Amino acid sequence: MRVLLALLLSAGPALAEPAIPRFVEEPGPDSTYAGGWEYMVGGGAASFDCDADGFADLLLAGGEAPARFLRNRSAQGGPLDFAAEPSGLELTAVTGAYPLDVDSDGVMDLALLRVGETVLMRGLGGCRFARANEDWGFDGGDAWTTAFAATWEVGADWPTLALGTYIDRTQEDFPWGSCTENRLYRPAGKGFAAPLPLTPSYCALSMLFTDWNRSGQPALRVSNDREYYKGGQEQLWHLAPGETPRLYTEAEGWARLRIWGMGIASQDLTGDGYPEYFLTSMADNKLQSLAATDAPLLPRYDDIAFARGATAHRPPEGGDLRPSTAWHPEFADVNNDGLSDLFIAKGNVSEMPDFAMEDPNNLLLQRPDGSFREAAAEAGVASLVTARGAALADFNMDGLLDLVVVNRNAPAQLWRNAGGATGHWIGVRPRQPGPNPDAVGGWLELRQGERIARREITVGGGHAGARLAGCTWGSAPGRKRSCG
């Protein structure tokens, strides 16, 4: 599936080194991801437009505190202005949230991940929401839920959902080896069938449906926390319509990988048409690229993080040289030069002495040769507060991506992208008639001269949250472009 849009732009000369955007911290939302050990993970941010004004609104996980909905009242090109309003989303025990138009009625719904029952919230319009588990036949369980992904399988009117869970919270004294069952929910009529187990389950902290081989058939990537599993690894699930999910095996090319898997971000960085995957961990971040793209295509990946300057394994600033702890990763073009950059939210789990306590966020700007340059401090987003989830979105509709970061046991932070030496941009909101109006699972392509940049439209990944709204593409200078 491709979403089609064509346009031509022009700009000035290209630069060998990426332009540094200037982020201005603005009064942050009155929201804190609060709590004890059950909230050491999670803390997601969901960005979506729930009142059809084109401006992205926010829901921030609150942990033991109620989740906080923030309506976007910003003026175009002006300071960022969010107001907390009652929405029906103010549940406690929320670890994360993902936007999705579940029933394809044109009004955004949300999945609220919780320590306890996961709740699907139906959008009523005007940024009001109501519980829909019973109406949609959705069994939200009672687990410590930390990961979510959604897609539309071929021919389906309703989405397929995946829930990833963490450890058995009744085993606080000895949680190792207590990973609970992940679940797959397929549609049945105007709702969902009983969930299918995705076992073995290894304490998932991020999930992503992705068409890794461009076959038109999504698979499910699962990133798992090695701290608590026994005999586990990263996972990739076959998801053939009507068939029981099954894991890719070593015989099919899948190599065993064990990391403290926290988050997933995907983007075609090499221009070969296939997505690369950035996996966050504790000092062991990976940037995976297909080892070979000739037939038969196998899910065998090389780690290109070191070669690309994207290991982000220790703090780039300050005197704390202990390893970093990475959470939410997100690819986006923050300086509008036509190249995907990478933001990584950082923060110690909970006073772990072997890892950095002063652990600033990363902002890796991509160079024209495909390597990355650290720029968080210069750009103004190298906060030392303990971060978890985040979202990059154009909150004031000026063509520049702004940033919100959810912090653990500290207030969330908000930055406005004030530009600097930035290029032109293209704003795109994919829409299609019928089921799946946001074209989840589709691909956007931006042609710039002989180069084609590709972006898969996904719901999932990151760490405990994601955005689903219009997207902004930077426009590389000096060439004709088309987006389709």
What are these regions (language model features)?
Residues E25-G63:
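Beta-strand-rich domains and repeat architectures in extracellular enzymes and scaffolds
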Residues E17-G35, A156-L161, T165, E243-P245, ...:
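Gly/Ser/Thr/Pro-enriched helix-cap/hinge segments flanking short amphipathic alpha-helices
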Residues L163-T180, S223-G231, I344-E358:
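Short, conserved, GDST-rich strand-edge loop motifs in beta-rich repeat architectures
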Residues T180-A188, E234-A240, P360-Q366:
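Beta-propeller blade signature
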Residues G42-A52, R71, V94-S104, M108, ...:
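Beta-propeller blade termini
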Residues V94-G96, V115-E153, D168-P175, C179-E181, ...:
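Asp-box/WD-like beta-propeller blade repeats and closely related beta-sheet repeat scaffolds
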Residues A19-W37, A83-T92, A132-W144, A194-C203, ...:
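Short loop/turn motifs that recur once per blade in beta-propeller domains
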Residues F55-G62, V107-R114, P159-Y166, M207, ...:
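Hydrophobic beta-strand segments that make up the repeating blades of beta-propeller
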